[in-house]
Amino acid sequence: MIRPLLTTDLDAAVELWYQASVQAHDFIPATFWREQQAAMRDIYLPASKSWVYEEDGQLLGFISWYQGSVAALFISPDHQSHGLGRQLLEHLKAQYDRLELTVYAENEQARRFYSRNGFKEGEQQLCEHSGRPELVMHWQRG
């Protein structure tokens, strides 16, 4: 079931974000993600509109929107490749006519996922937090 993120979900969402980030970004040290956990819980998630995918009381994934962008889309490593990310992305696409996001250039799996879901790769830039190259991807209804 997809539902809005509640403040009571924050700890579980941050733990899921950490586990999925370490798994998906093996080109960035795990310490980087660990150092970002407090900001994710206290700044980024509260500032965003977020929805979770919950099953049997367990948070399996979440998506966050902030100022026209998909700010986060993370699925528990144990539940990836079962369509949960696509469902969360479709939930967001149903509410907006256009979206953009950034994805690390080295994250081939995420780039393929977003391309399969209608996003087009655009400009390349450096991530302000990690200094790694990332791509801006765009989606527009129509």
Question: Which residues does each PLM region occupy?
Answer:
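Conserved catalytic-core motifs of GNAT/GCN5-like acyltransferases
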Residues: 102-104, 120-136
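A short, internal acetyl-CoA/4′-phosphopantetheine-binding micro-motif in the GNAT/acyltransferase core
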Residues: 66, 70-80, 104
